[in-house]
Structures are given as structure tokens and as C-alpha cells.
């Protein structure tokens, strides 16, 4: 506490106002002390340039165009903007007494009135409900705003006392009704509660932030977990976690697959390697120098506690090493581990994931031993033996996880029709995709014997209001023989315009013999029509 007040400098008077305000309320005083004690290191970015980028991001939501931001001079101007060049406003130097008091009062209000408050302790309340910020977002008086908006909604959806079911009902409602626009085009700090209350645009971070604001405003103990890299999808990812009444933790992300449910024992199926939790309290851990003091290693909550002694190369010196995972763009550091007597002490890792011990010199990561993986409680090393090469037929590069299955399920119900009239005033159904594709290359064998010149692909109707069912095709080819390897000549002659009016996703990309280009329609259920040049009997698609 003394350190925090010293760091406040001239702003110390504001923080002491809060402490004096609660001098006769021991519990709220301790809550204030918790926030002030852990305030050093927290801060946010507030700048007119951030508002300019947000204006571009708003447009995607206002135009309801889905996962792309509309092209504009504004968009091109800010595409390379990096917020980290801006000055950061330390909370300890700018926090007002009024803001902190309002945050504490509103937090205690919901804690005292909600039926699930009895499920968690005061310490849990301080870490899981009380914090006024998540990351580096601009500060808003968000608690009452979110409470007033979502408390009536929760009451209309659920009136019981089961905390898990209450979260499940509200999260599933968001899944069905919230329009979320995915974009990774801008490097921005956390967007903030007020912005996200109107515009859900960004990445998984913005969905988890929105959920934290909603559920904490209603008294639910909610936090955010993340991994830095997953071999399942080659990215980082974050999701929400609910602290259960039995002390356990329930992970969820409400924009996950269409059959998403908040329930005990659930998992998204992604490999995680190492898992970290976002915290308001600072932690003096071995990874603080890597990720900052506001992350806590919680891998053991997902995979149990474990420890393994892993061999390192003989030339490795020092008393510590880095633990990493391989990615196509280089190694991703996920932990720091001690070295003792020529071995690394690696603890709390996910079995079945390949890791790599690393050294770091001038910012360059280099292997410090063979890759390894834990299998059945033992360390398995991957040491190459070129005398035992084998040939493998690989159908997928990555496992078919639930979220990928959800993407591919949007093809279910799509129809392919044929006609000799380019405007399809009469047509015959050639094929209907009745099941979710399992991979990106699929063959279908029509039973029609008549020749037709024109083919039309139509995506399925949306399963729920915010579902994205636009045409998205990398390649659609037609064959006059089931044994033929050479497809019939075809040309996309008309269809819905490409998303964002981007020529890179125009209709010609659906039949250009390049699997890495694709047609992506701007509107829902936009069809695309192909001309086979003359009437043909289609035996294979």
C-alpha cells in the first residue's frame, strides 16, 4: 500500500479520499485497499487517433456486412496504426476518488443482492467481480450502465438461483442475438465497455471483454483465460471462465459453436499447451518478465498438476530456459523453466502437445534440446532417425475441432441446381448438402441423366438471426465422368457482389483452379451461377 501511494505522486490525495471515505466500513475499506494496492502497472490509452480507428470499426457493424470492414480512405489511412506508440495513462496517477467509490459501491450492491453471492468469498469477490478494468481500455463508468441494461434481460430469461444456469441462459441469448464482426486488421488496445455495449467488433478478446462487463455488472465471478499459441489453430485465443460454487472453474466463450452450452466439464477441444489467467492482482512469478505481472499460470486447473525432468543439450549454460511451441512463423514462448543438473524442470503442461526448450540470445530463440511431448505420464523425445523414413497419407493438417466443425456446418443445406435457362425460371435439383463436410475437398455424385448448361449454387438459410450464411467457395468444379480427373470448362457469369467490393473475393475466384482464392458474397444467401458453355451431363461435383 505504501508503495502504491508513493507511486501516485500528486494523485495521492484522491486515493486517500477513498480510504477516508470507507474508514468506518471495514469490508469496503479492504476492497479499496485491494484496488489501490494493485493499481501500479494498470493503465489505459485515451487518444483522438484511437477514436478515429474506432469510427472505421463501427462502420462494419452499422452496415451489417459481417466479417470484413468496408474499404474506404479512412480504413487505408489507419491500417498500419500501432497504438503502442501512444502514451499510456497510469491509473495510479490519474484515478479519481469519485470513480473508484462508484465502482466499489456498485460492486457491493450486486454482491449483496444477487442470489449467487453466497457461492464465493470476499477474496473471490475482490479478484473476480470488483476490478474496474480488464486491460488497457479507456475507463468508463460501466457498471451501472451494464446493470441497467442487462439485469431486466436476465430476469426475463431466468428466475432461478443456479449460477451456472443463469450464465448459460444469458450467454446463449448473446450467441443467438449479438452481431459480432470479426476483424484482425487493426492493432488496438482493449476497446472499452461503452464502445462494446454498442459495437461488438474485433476478435475473441472483445467477446470475452464484453462478457466480463456484463456478468461482473450482475455479480457473477467471471474472468478471462488464454493461451499464447495452440497447435490446433496456430493462434492465440482467450475465453471466459466462471468460478463455480464448488471452487472449480467453468470455461466458456459465448460465440463458440452453435451448440454452445455453459456447463461443468466442458471444453472447446483446442489444444492449449499452457493456460494463463488475466488478473487484477499483480503476481511476482517466473513469467512476469515475459508476460507482465497480471497473468497467473492456471494450466493445472485444466490438466492437473505435473512435473517432468527434460533433457537439454550439453552446451546449454545458465540456470533457466524458456519453454516454447513451434509455429510456422517461429517459436512461441509459453513459460520459463529452471535448469538443474543438465535437465529442465517443466511443470503443469498439457499432455499430447509438442514443446521445445529454448535459449534466447539478442531476441533470437534457439532450440536447447529435442522437441518433446508427454504421453501416458512419460516424456517422449522426437529425435530424428533418417534410416526409418515412412510415407504417410495425411488428409488434414489439423484436427477437426468443434469451432471448425461449426464453420463447415454453415454449408449444410446448401443447394446446387441445374437449368438450361440462365435465369433459372425452371430448374432441377442436382445436389443438396445434407451433412457437414469433414474436410475441404468433397465429392458429390448426382443421379441426373439430362444435360444442362447452367449451374447455380445457393447457400442455406440462416439457422438463427445472426448466423452468417453467405456464399463462401474456394472452388466448385463439374465432371462428365466419375473417373475423370479433368473438370469441365466453366465460368461464373453472375452472382452476389463480393464482400467489401473486394475483387480478391469476386465470383471468378470460385472456378479459377486456385484453391487458395475464394468467392465470398457480400449478402446473405447470395447465389452464384456457372456457365458450362454447352449442355452437359454432370456425373461428379
Predicted features, each with a name:
Residues 305-314:
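A short, amphipathic beta-strand motif
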Residues 6, 10, 14-17, 24-200, ...:
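Secondary-structure boundary elements
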Residues 343-356, 360-363, 449:
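Short Pro-Gly-centered beta-turn/loop motif in secreted/extracellular proteins
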Residues 319-337, 417-424:
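Short amphipathic beta-strand segments in non-cytosolic proteins
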Residues 361-387, 469:
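Structured interaction patches on ligand/partner-binding surfaces of diverse proteins
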Residues 388-429, 435-540:
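Aromatic, loop-rich ligand-recognition surfaces of beta-strand-rich domains
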